[in-house]
Protein backbone atom coordinates (compact mmCIF):
# COMPACT_ATOMS: atom_id res chain seq x y z
CA UNK A 1 0.00 0.00 0.00
CA UNK A 2 1.39 3.37 -0.97
CA UNK A 3 1.57 6.16 1.59
CA UNK A 4 -0.82 9.09 1.27
CA UNK A 5 0.62 11.79 -0.97
CA UNK A 6 1.93 14.88 0.80
CA UNK A 7 1.89 17.68 -1.79
CA UNK A 8 4.05 20.72 -1.10
CA UNK A 9 5.91 18.97 1.71
CA UNK A 10 9.70 19.00 1.42
CA UNK A 11 12.37 16.99 3.20
CA UNK A 12 15.65 18.90 2.97
CA UNK A 13 18.42 16.30 3.15
CA UNK A 14 21.86 17.65 4.11
CA UNK A 15 24.77 15.24 3.73
CA UNK A 16 28.53 15.39 3.67
CA UNK A 17 31.67 14.19 5.42
CA UNK A 18 32.34 14.53 9.12
CA UNK A 19 33.48 17.98 10.34
CA UNK A 20 32.33 19.74 7.15
CA UNK A 21 29.76 21.91 8.95
CA UNK A 22 26.41 20.12 8.61
CA UNK A 23 25.16 20.96 12.11
CA UNK A 24 25.65 24.72 11.85
CA UNK A 25 24.12 24.86 8.37
CA UNK A 26 21.09 22.80 9.39
CA UNK A 27 20.44 25.03 12.38
CA UNK A 28 20.57 28.05 10.06
CA UNK A 29 18.15 26.45 7.58
CA UNK A 30 15.83 25.21 10.33
CA UNK A 31 15.62 28.68 11.86
CA UNK A 32 15.00 30.21 8.44
CA UNK A 33 12.13 27.85 7.68
CA UNK A 34 10.99 27.57 11.33
CA UNK A 35 11.23 23.80 11.36
CA UNK A 36 12.94 20.81 13.03
CA UNK A 37 15.96 18.58 12.42
CA UNK A 38 16.08 14.78 12.24
CA UNK A 39 19.53 13.30 12.81
CA UNK A 40 20.62 10.39 10.63
CA UNK A 41 23.94 9.84 12.36
CA UNK A 42 24.32 6.22 13.45
CA UNK A 43 26.27 7.14 16.60
CA UNK A 44 24.63 10.37 17.79
CA UNK A 45 21.57 8.32 18.80
CA UNK A 46 23.42 6.99 21.82
CA UNK A 47 23.65 8.41 25.31
CA UNK A 48 27.03 9.04 26.96
CA UNK A 49 28.76 9.63 23.59
CA UNK A 50 28.24 13.38 23.45
CA UNK A 51 31.83 14.46 22.76
CA UNK A 52 33.10 11.67 20.55
CA UNK A 53 30.13 11.80 18.17
CA UNK A 54 30.03 15.63 18.05
CA UNK A 55 26.40 15.74 19.09
CA UNK A 56 24.71 19.14 18.78
CA UNK A 57 25.19 21.00 22.04
CA UNK A 58 22.38 21.56 24.51
CA UNK A 59 22.36 25.22 23.47
CA UNK A 60 22.00 24.26 19.79
CA UNK A 61 19.20 21.84 20.63
CA UNK A 62 17.43 24.62 22.52
CA UNK A 63 17.66 26.84 19.43
CA UNK A 64 16.15 24.19 17.14
CA UNK A 65 14.42 20.97 18.06
CA UNK A 66 16.47 17.88 17.13
CA UNK A 67 15.23 14.29 16.93
CA UNK A 68 17.18 11.03 17.37
CA UNK A 69 19.93 12.63 19.46
CA UNK A 70 21.17 11.21 22.78
CA UNK A 71 18.12 8.97 23.14
CA UNK A 72 19.23 5.30 23.46
CA UNK A 73 21.30 3.50 26.12
CA UNK A 74 24.77 2.51 24.97
CA UNK A 75 23.92 -1.21 24.76
CA UNK A 76 20.87 -0.72 22.51
CA UNK A 77 20.99 -2.29 19.05
CA UNK A 78 19.51 0.18 16.58
CA UNK A 79 19.62 -0.72 12.91
CA UNK A 80 19.29 1.38 9.77
CA UNK A 81 16.07 -0.44 8.93
CA UNK A 82 14.50 0.37 12.28
CA UNK A 83 15.63 3.97 12.01
CA UNK A 84 14.09 4.22 8.54
CA UNK A 85 10.71 3.03 9.77
CA UNK A 86 10.64 5.16 12.92
CA UNK A 87 11.93 8.30 11.23
CA UNK A 88 9.35 8.02 8.44
CA UNK A 89 6.59 7.76 11.04
CA UNK A 90 8.00 10.88 12.70
CA UNK A 91 8.36 12.73 9.38
CA UNK A 92 4.75 12.03 8.43
CA UNK A 93 3.65 13.34 11.83
CA UNK A 94 5.83 16.47 11.71
CA UNK A 95 4.58 17.35 8.23
CA UNK A 96 1.21 18.04 9.87
CA UNK A 97 2.69 21.28 11.22
CA UNK A 98 5.67 22.01 8.94
CA UNK A 99 6.08 22.47 5.19
CA UNK A 100 9.81 21.78 5.44
CA UNK A 101 11.81 19.32 7.54
CA UNK A 102 15.54 18.66 7.70
CA UNK A 103 17.26 15.28 7.66
CA UNK A 104 21.01 15.34 8.14
CA UNK A 105 23.94 13.06 8.80
CA UNK A 106 27.00 11.39 7.41
CA UNK A 107 25.74 7.81 7.69
CA UNK A 108 24.85 6.98 4.10
CA UNK A 109 22.95 3.81 4.89
CA UNK A 110 20.69 5.62 7.37
CA UNK A 111 20.03 8.43 4.90
CA UNK A 112 19.18 5.80 2.29
CA UNK A 113 16.79 4.06 4.69
CA UNK A 114 14.70 7.23 4.86
CA UNK A 115 15.00 8.49 1.29
CA UNK A 116 14.84 5.23 -0.65
CA UNK A 117 14.21 2.38 1.76
CA UNK A 118 16.30 -0.73 2.24
CA UNK A 119 15.65 -3.93 0.37
CA UNK A 120 14.88 -7.05 2.29
CA UNK A 121 18.04 -9.01 2.94
CA UNK A 122 18.17 -12.83 2.88
CA UNK A 123 17.80 -14.79 6.08
CA UNK A 124 21.14 -15.70 7.62
CA UNK A 125 21.54 -19.09 9.27
CA UNK A 126 22.82 -19.38 12.82
CA UNK A 127 25.78 -21.37 11.47
CA UNK A 128 26.92 -18.54 9.20
CA UNK A 129 26.35 -15.93 11.89
CA UNK A 130 28.30 -17.98 14.39
CA UNK A 131 31.12 -18.55 11.93
CA UNK A 132 31.82 -14.85 11.40
CA UNK A 133 31.32 -13.90 15.04
CA UNK A 134 33.85 -16.55 16.06
CA UNK A 135 36.26 -15.42 13.36
CA UNK A 136 35.96 -11.87 14.62
CA UNK A 137 36.75 -12.95 18.19
CA UNK A 138 39.69 -15.15 17.17
CA UNK A 139 41.27 -13.21 14.29
CA UNK A 140 40.04 -9.67 14.82
CA UNK A 141 38.43 -7.10 12.56
CA UNK A 142 41.39 -6.83 10.19
CA UNK A 143 40.87 -10.41 8.98
CA UNK A 144 37.21 -9.71 8.22
CA UNK A 145 38.05 -6.46 6.44
CA UNK A 146 40.55 -8.29 4.24
CA UNK A 147 37.95 -10.91 3.36
CA UNK A 148 35.38 -8.22 2.54
CA UNK A 149 37.84 -6.56 0.15
CA UNK A 150 37.90 -9.83 -1.79
CA UNK A 151 34.22 -10.80 -1.54
CA UNK A 152 32.71 -7.36 -2.20
CA UNK A 153 35.26 -4.72 -3.28
CA UNK A 154 32.51 -2.18 -4.09
CA UNK A 155 31.08 -2.22 -0.56
CA UNK A 156 34.61 -2.30 0.87
CA UNK A 157 35.24 1.13 -0.66
CA UNK A 158 32.34 2.83 1.13
CA UNK A 159 31.60 0.96 4.36
CA UNK A 160 32.90 2.12 7.73
CA UNK A 161 35.70 -0.43 8.07
CA UNK A 162 35.94 0.26 11.80
CA UNK A 163 32.39 -1.00 12.33
CA UNK A 164 32.45 -4.80 12.78
CA UNK A 165 28.66 -5.10 12.65
CA UNK A 166 28.50 -3.74 9.11
CA UNK A 167 31.51 -5.71 7.91
CA UNK A 168 30.15 -8.95 9.38
CA UNK A 169 26.67 -8.31 7.97
CA UNK A 170 28.07 -7.91 4.47
CA UNK A 171 30.14 -11.09 4.75
CA UNK A 172 27.13 -13.03 6.05
CA UNK A 173 25.11 -12.07 2.99
CA UNK A 174 28.01 -12.89 0.67
CA UNK A 175 28.35 -16.37 2.17
CA UNK A 176 24.61 -17.06 2.36
CA UNK A 177 23.84 -16.05 -1.24
CA UNK A 178 27.10 -16.29 -3.14
CA UNK A 179 26.49 -12.70 -4.28
CA UNK A 180 28.06 -9.40 -3.19
CA UNK A 181 26.21 -7.56 -0.45
CA UNK A 182 26.38 -4.39 -2.56
CA UNK A 183 24.24 -6.08 -5.21
CA UNK A 184 21.32 -6.27 -2.78
CA UNK A 185 21.85 -2.72 -1.57
CA UNK A 186 21.64 -1.21 -5.04
CA UNK A 187 18.27 -2.75 -5.88
CA UNK A 188 15.37 -0.32 -6.04
CA UNK A 189 11.68 -1.09 -5.54
CA UNK A 190 8.57 0.89 -6.47
CA UNK A 191 7.08 0.72 -2.97
CA UNK A 192 10.00 2.76 -1.69
CA UNK A 193 8.73 5.91 -3.43
CA UNK A 194 8.14 8.58 -0.79
CA UNK A 195 4.98 10.71 -0.62
CA UNK A 196 6.96 13.92 -0.03
CA UNK A 197 9.53 15.70 -2.17
CA UNK A 198 13.23 15.63 -1.29
CA UNK A 199 15.80 18.39 -1.76
CA UNK A 200 19.27 16.87 -1.41
CA UNK A 201 22.14 19.16 -0.51
CA UNK A 202 25.75 18.02 -0.17
CA UNK A 203 28.46 19.91 1.69
CA UNK A 204 32.13 19.64 0.79
CA UNK A 205 35.38 21.54 1.17
CA UNK A 206 38.81 21.48 -0.39
CA UNK A 207 40.36 18.21 0.80
CA UNK A 208 43.24 19.87 2.67
CA UNK A 209 40.88 22.27 4.43
CA UNK A 210 38.54 19.43 5.38
CA UNK A 211 41.44 17.46 6.84
CA UNK A 212 42.57 20.53 8.80
CA UNK A 213 39.08 20.85 10.25
CA UNK A 214 39.08 17.17 11.18
CA UNK A 215 42.40 17.52 13.01
CA UNK A 216 41.16 20.66 14.79
CA UNK A 217 37.94 18.93 15.81
CA UNK A 218 39.85 15.99 17.30
CA UNK A 219 42.04 18.37 19.29
CA UNK A 220 38.93 20.21 20.46
CA UNK A 221 37.27 16.94 21.51
CA UNK A 222 40.30 16.06 23.61
CA UNK A 223 40.15 19.48 25.26
CA UNK A 224 36.43 18.99 25.95
CA UNK A 225 37.10 15.72 27.79
CA UNK A 226 36.91 12.91 25.23
CA UNK A 227 39.40 10.79 27.17
CA UNK A 228 37.28 11.05 30.31
CA UNK A 229 34.16 10.16 28.28
CA UNK A 230 35.91 7.09 26.86
CA UNK A 231 37.24 6.08 30.27
CA UNK A 232 33.69 6.12 31.67
CA UNK A 233 32.55 3.89 28.78
CA UNK A 234 35.42 1.41 29.09
CA UNK A 235 33.27 -1.28 30.81
CA UNK A 236 30.99 -1.21 27.72
CA UNK A 237 33.78 -1.27 25.13
CA UNK A 238 32.41 -4.40 23.40
CA UNK A 239 29.07 -2.73 22.61
CA UNK A 240 28.47 -2.18 18.91
CA UNK A 241 27.85 1.53 19.45
CA UNK A 242 31.46 1.94 20.57
CA UNK A 243 33.06 0.15 17.63
CA UNK A 244 33.81 3.47 16.03
CA UNK A 245 36.53 6.03 15.46
CA UNK A 246 37.55 8.00 18.52
CA UNK A 247 36.55 5.36 21.01
CA UNK A 248 38.48 2.36 19.73
CA UNK A 249 41.78 4.26 19.59
CA UNK A 250 41.41 5.58 23.14
CA UNK A 251 40.40 2.15 24.39
CA UNK A 252 43.73 1.08 22.91
CA UNK A 253 45.45 3.77 24.95
CA UNK A 254 43.69 2.60 28.12
CA UNK A 255 44.78 -0.96 27.29
CA UNK A 256 48.37 0.37 27.00
CA UNK A 257 48.61 -0.57 23.32
CA UNK A 258 49.25 3.05 22.31
CA UNK A 259 50.61 6.16 23.89
CA UNK A 260 48.11 8.99 24.15
CA UNK A 261 49.90 10.83 21.35
CA UNK A 262 49.70 7.73 19.13
CA UNK A 263 46.00 7.28 19.90
CA UNK A 264 45.20 10.89 18.99
CA UNK A 265 47.18 10.57 15.76
CA UNK A 266 45.23 7.40 14.90
CA UNK A 267 41.91 9.13 15.57
CA UNK A 268 42.84 11.88 13.13
CA UNK A 269 44.04 9.43 10.49
CA UNK A 270 41.02 7.13 10.81
CA UNK A 271 38.60 10.07 10.77
CA UNK A 272 40.17 11.34 7.54
CA UNK A 273 39.76 7.89 6.04
CA UNK A 274 36.15 7.76 7.17
CA UNK A 275 35.48 11.18 5.61
CA UNK A 276 36.91 9.92 2.33
CA UNK A 277 34.56 6.91 2.38
CA UNK A 278 31.61 9.17 3.16
CA UNK A 279 32.42 11.31 0.12
CA UNK A 280 32.77 8.20 -2.03
CA UNK A 281 29.27 7.13 -0.98
CA UNK A 282 27.56 10.47 -1.51
CA UNK A 283 29.32 11.63 -4.69
CA UNK A 284 28.02 8.55 -6.49
CA UNK A 285 24.49 9.96 -6.16
CA UNK A 286 23.47 12.20 -9.02
CA UNK A 287 20.56 13.97 -7.29
CA UNK A 288 22.69 15.82 -4.72
CA UNK A 289 23.49 19.50 -5.30
CA UNK A 290 26.90 20.34 -3.83
CA UNK A 291 27.86 23.52 -1.97
CA UNK A 292 30.53 24.86 0.33
CA UNK A 293 29.10 25.14 3.87
CA UNK A 294 29.52 28.93 3.88
CA UNK A 295 27.32 29.44 0.78
CA UNK A 296 24.27 30.17 2.93
CA UNK A 297 22.42 32.47 0.52
CA UNK A 298 23.04 30.15 -2.43
CA UNK A 299 21.70 27.17 -0.48
CA UNK A 300 18.54 29.01 0.60
CA UNK A 301 18.12 30.25 -2.97
CA UNK A 302 18.45 26.70 -4.29
CA UNK A 303 15.73 25.49 -1.93
CA UNK A 304 13.39 28.29 -3.02
CA UNK A 305 14.14 27.60 -6.69
CA UNK A 306 13.43 23.89 -6.17
CA UNK A 307 10.07 24.56 -4.56
CA UNK A 308 9.09 27.46 -6.81
CA UNK A 309 8.75 29.66 -3.73
CA UNK A 310 9.87 33.28 -4.05
CA UNK A 311 11.06 33.35 -0.46
CA UNK A 312 9.95 33.88 3.08
CA UNK A 313 9.62 37.43 4.31
From Swiss-Prot:
It catalyses: adenosine(37) in tRNA + dimethylallyl diphosphate = N(6)-dimethylallyladenosine(37) in tRNA + diphosphate. Keywords: ATP-binding, Magnesium, Nucleotide-binding, Transferase, tRNA processing. One of its GO terms (molecular function) is tRNA dimethylallyltransferase activity. The record marks 107, 129 as: Interaction with substrate tRNA. Its EC number is 2.5.1.75. Pfam families: IPPT. GO terms for biological process: tRNA modification. Catalyzes the transfer of a dimethylallyl group onto the adenine at position 37 in tRNAs that read codons beginning with uridine, leading to the formation of N6-(dimethylallyl)adenosine (i(6)A). Belongs to the IPP transferase family. This is tRNA dimethylallyltransferase.
Amino acid sequence: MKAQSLPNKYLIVVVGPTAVGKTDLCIYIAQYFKTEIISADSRQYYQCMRIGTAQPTIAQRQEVRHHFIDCFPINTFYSAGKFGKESLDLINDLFNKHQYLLLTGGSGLYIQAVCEGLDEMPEISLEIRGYFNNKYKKEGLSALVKELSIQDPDYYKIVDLNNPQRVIRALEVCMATGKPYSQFRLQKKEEHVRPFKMIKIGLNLDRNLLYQRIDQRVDQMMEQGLLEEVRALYPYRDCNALQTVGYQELFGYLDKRYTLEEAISLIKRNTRRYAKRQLTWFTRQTDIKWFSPNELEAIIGYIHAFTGDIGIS
